[in-house]
Regions:
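Active-site loop-to-helix "anion-binding N-cap" substructures in soluble metabolic enzymes
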Residues: 1-170
Length: 170
């Protein structure tokens, strides 16, 4: 049977109480839907509350970002080791907003991807073109190059823990 992945991120929304309420509303809607993985990637401050609310359901809680270093002077960042110590299994890397607003590059996406995989996490890798590239008709070339650069050095074995999400920057 084909297995589907339904993943979403909450961006900078939901307090812990709102996250709990949202998950409690969703849980009855997905009962018995065993052919899909449902993943909500949450802001760091809501992860614990979301995990607690998701207990006993098929909902998995992930993070919206991860840094490539294990530790250090990276104010505001969180390492893969920190996330896994909190029971976080999934992480989004390369989201269009991270690329657009925070200047994430294919190089930093690659470093983050390898760090998350090394920590045993599952990566939701976002790929996609900017509007100008879409209008120029080079989407396929751009996404192909991103795939090559973002996954450089990632083994075939590690690819079992990578989910590719098409997420354009427009």
């Amino acid at each position: 049977m084909k297995r589907y992945v339904i993943a979403g991120n909450w961006k900078m929304n939901f307090t812990p109480a709102e996250a709990t309420s949202f998950i409690n509303e969703i849980k009855p809607m997905i009962e018995g839907k065993n052919n899909c993985d449902i993943i909500f990637c949450a802001p760091y401050v809501t992860i614990a509350a979301a995990q607690e609310a998701a207990k006993g359901s098929q909902i998995k809680i992930g993070a919206e970002n991860v840094h490539f270093a294990d530790k250090g002077a990276y104010t505001g960042e969180v390492s893969a080791k920190m996330l896994t110590s909190c029971g976080v299994e999934y992480v989004i890397i390369g989201h269009s907003e991270r690329r657009q607003y925070f200047g994430e590059t294919d190089e930093t996406v690659n470093l983050r991807t390898k760090a998350a995989l090394a920590a045993g996490m599952k990566v939701i890798l976002c790929l996609g073109e900017v509007k100008e590239q879409r209008l120029a008709g080079i989407t396929k070339e751009v996404v192909s190059m991103q795939t090559k650069l973002d996954l450089a050095g990632v083994s075939a074995e590690d690819m079992k823990n990578v989910i590719i999400a098409y997420e354009p920057v427009w």
